[in-house]
């Protein structure tokens, strides 16, 4: 069960995808508004929610995200957002028999970045990146930055600069993420940032992605054709 697409669905009942261990992608229309519990229990390969809705449209995405604490990518028409994993803990204060609820991971805060009407609050989402840099891995931060830069709906100049600065400081992780995802748009974006491509080209060849290697080799050939009068 690689992909499920239900355009007319309004309600997802409890345990709708229970034990769908091969489920990787769920595609829904804009009208989903009711969600039961335990929707994706044991769906350990789930990677993507695709909502066929405008990037600024009110949707049920916030509730849908609440059903998944693992890493998840969201695709809207014109936007792509990556939400990192978060964990919840109940710690018992033994003498008082009180349980303290704690949450670990910036992914929880990012899942709260919505307007009162139910649309994604892109400014709030982008503002969470600085805190995410404290605790998230290079790979996850590169996924987040690449998604926002490749489809920059609602992306402000300051946030764009922050994402580009992070990718520039972590070229190896950025290229590896783009290559592992076979994401040619992300690869071209990184090339456009003038990042060194030699190691990325070697990795492309190693994993057998010829289209990506062509993008990187094209950059290298163009670079060799440039010169100034000092070369004469």
Where do the language-model regions lie?
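Structural signature of tandem-repeat unit edges
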Residues: 1-11, 21-34, 44-60, 69-146, ...
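Repeat-mediated protein-protein interaction surfaces in helical alpha-solenoids
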Residues: 148-163
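Recurring C-terminal helix/loop segment of individual leucine-rich repeat
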Residues: 14-18, 37-41
């Amino acid at each position: 069960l690689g992909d499920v697409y239900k355009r007319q669905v309004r309600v997802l009942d409890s345990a709708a995808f229970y034990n769908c261990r091969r489920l990787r992608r769920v595609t829904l229309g804009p009208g989903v508004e009711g969600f039961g519990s335990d929707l994706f229990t044991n769906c350990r390969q789930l990677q993507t929610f695709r909502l066929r809705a405008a990037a600024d449209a009110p949707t049920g995405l916030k509730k849908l995200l609440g059903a998944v604490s693992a890493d998840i990518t969201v695709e809207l028409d014109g936007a792509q957002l990556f939400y990192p994993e978060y964990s919840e803990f109940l710690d018992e204060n033994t003498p008082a028999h009180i349980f303290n609820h704690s949450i670990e991971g910036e992914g929880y805060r990012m899942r709260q970045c919505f307007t009162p009407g139910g649309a994604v609050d892109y400014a709030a989402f982008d503002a969470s990146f600085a805190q995410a840099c404290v605790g998230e891995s290079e790979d996850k931060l590169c996924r987040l930055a690449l998604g926002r830069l490749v489809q920059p709906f609602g992306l402000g100049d300051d946030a764009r600069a922050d994402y580009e600065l992070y990718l520039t400081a972590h070229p190896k992780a950025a290229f590896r993420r783009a290559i592992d995802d076979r994401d040619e748009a992300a690869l071209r974006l990184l090339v456009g940032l003038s990042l060194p491509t030699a190691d990325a080209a070697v990795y492309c060849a190693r994993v057998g992605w010829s289209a990506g290697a062509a993008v990187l080799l094209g950059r290298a050939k163009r670079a060799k054709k440039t010169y100034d009068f000092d070369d004469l």
